[in-house]
Each structure stands twice: as C-alpha cells, then as structure tokens.
C-alpha cells in the first residue's frame, strides 16, 4: 500500500471504521478544532454515515468536547478522555497562559483565580451554558473584572479549563 493511502486510511478519510463521533475522536486521540464550523465537517466526513446534526448532537450531549487540552488551540476530545489528558497537559498550558498574561500585564493572582472558579461553579450549576461574554458580565458584577476585558477573560477561562471546572 502506498503512503498516501495509508495516511488517508489512518485519518479515517478512506474506508472509515466508525459510526459515532465519540468513537472517532477517541480513536484519533484529539482533533484540532480551531474553526468550529469546519471541525463539524471534519468529524462528519470521517464517519461511515453522518450528518452535521450527528456531530452537533455529540457536542451538545458532551460526548465530544471542544477545549484547549493540548495547547492554547481548540481541540476536540472524547469526554471520557478529558481528565487524563488534562493531567498530562495542564501544567504546561497553565505556564503558557501565565506567560501570555504577564506579556500583556494581566497578572492574575491565585486568589483571584480561586474566586473565579467559585463563581463559575455557581453560575454554571445544573449544566447551565453561558457564553464567554455572559460569564464576563457575571465577573464584572462580582468584582473579579473591573470591565469586560477579552484578554483577561480568556486567561480566566483557559485556566478554568485546565482545572477541569469548565469545558467549552
């Protein structure tokens, strides 16, 4: 077999093996998912038979997760794999997050991160889903943020992902 065909087969683009998005994503380990619309197509085209709704349903149910598990880039991972992956990568991601924050003079104390985690748990309790902007409004009302600052808000959310508190 030629190398291009082996690659297509391993990427599940030739004779796909899986029917469900979570099976595929788990088998691959992770899929880069920076562009949300395109990653749904990327998953769907690697399944035996799927629609965009099949992939959206797996995301909505939390069977596959879109998160920053490997680096500050979005990836899809199977829900059952997220904890062990976070254990492997969280320290490095936290370090990169902190370095980025310092570069923008956005140093955030551990105390403030802890306060943000408590608020996130409170406002997202019961599988509630909020946008980053809606969460930022809660952070402003509670005094965690003085104003809705996207860079600072991103630091809070990336750190909360690494702690396993939220998953996008």
Please provide the spans of the model-predicted regions.
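Nucleic-acid-contacting surfaces of polymerase cores and analogous helical-repeat interfaces
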Residues: 100-106, 161-168
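Toprim catalytic domain recognition across nucleic-acid enzymes
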Residues: 146-154, 166
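Short, hydrophobic-biased segments on the C-terminal half of alpha helices
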Residues: 55-56, 154-158
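Phosphate-backbone binding and catalysis cores of DNA-processing enzymes
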Residues: 1-149
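Hydrophobic mid-domain F-helix/FG-region of cytochrome P450s
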Residues: 149, 160-161
